[in-house]
């Protein structure tokens, strides 16, 4: 399981270090960190991050970045790699995207779950998204003195998928990947409560369907990661082929990632 790193104002921040691969090696601590957006951080947060990381990868859309730009962390490089474009409703936290999605799905839990599942499939079937995740992995292949941190808005879908991809490449067993993916529900309880309250306020309703829908839209569900893996198998046959044909990695790239991040 990844390790939660607690900050004043940085949600769902986790070090993948300590996760155990199928061959018994573990991911090196202090090298791979996922999080939510680096917006409105405290001075303490920034100081701590500057000692932990040397690279930030921002996976959000341009609209999200413009609405809530990352705070500058001294001593770090910044890479903007938006992994979704026009199909981002349900994944993006840009204001218009959230409002439209809530309006459509607030009383439809099954529709909400299916909507998010379809987003995870699009990560695989969109050549644009694949190329962007390939760029993410290229940065991980570079040499780094400290950790690489990648984030989206709350560290759930896009950052979560990036974590799933690198964990799978490093040989972490599927069940461990899924268990870690679902921990987001524990770490974003406050965020989810805010979204439920927002939806109830917008609809002026206390219908129990609202909470169910919001949990699917703003939490994680096993069906999402299963949809991702299913899409990989449908399009590429195996994850190995996905790594090569989808993400553009060579055999030597995969081996180098394992050498760099496992011990």
Feature annotation, model-predicted:
Residues 1-149, 162-263:
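Cys-dependent protein tyrosine phosphatase-like superfamily
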Residues 154, 158-159:
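Ser/Thr-glycine-rich phosphate-binding loops at phosphate-binding pockets of nucleotides
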């Amino acid at each position: 399981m990844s390790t939660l790193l607690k900050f004043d104002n940085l949600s769902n921040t986790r070090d993948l270090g300590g996760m155990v691969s199928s061959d018994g090696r573990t991911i090196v601590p202090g090298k791979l960190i996922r999080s939510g957006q680096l917006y409105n951080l405290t001075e303490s947060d920034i100081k701590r991050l500057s000692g932990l990381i040397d690279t930030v990868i921002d996976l959000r859309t341009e609209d999200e970045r413009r609405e809530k730009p990352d705070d500058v962390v001294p001593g770090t490089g910044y890479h903007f790699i938006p992994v979704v474009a026009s199909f981002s409703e349900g994944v993006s936290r840009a204001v218009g995207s959230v409002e439209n999605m809530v309006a459509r799905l607030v009383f439809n839990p099954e529709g909400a779950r299916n909507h998010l599942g379809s987003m995870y499939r699009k990560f695989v079937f969109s050549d644009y998204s694949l190329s962007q995740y390939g760029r993410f992995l290229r940065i991980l292949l570079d040499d780094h003195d400290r950790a690489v941190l990648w984030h989206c808005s709350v560290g759930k879908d896009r950052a979560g998928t990036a974590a799933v991809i690198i964990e799978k490449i490093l040989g972490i067993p599927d069940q461990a990947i899924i268990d870690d993916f679902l921990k987001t529900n524990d770490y974003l309880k406050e965020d989810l409560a805010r979204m439920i309250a927002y939806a109830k306020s917008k609809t002026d309703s206390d219908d129990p369907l609202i909470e169910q829908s919001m949990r699917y839209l703003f939490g994680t569900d096993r069906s999402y990661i299963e949809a991702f893996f299913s899409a990989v198998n449908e399009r590429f046959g195996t994850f190995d082929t996905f790594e090569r044909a989808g993400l553009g990695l060579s055999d030597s790239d995969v081996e180098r990632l394992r050498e760099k991040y496992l011990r």
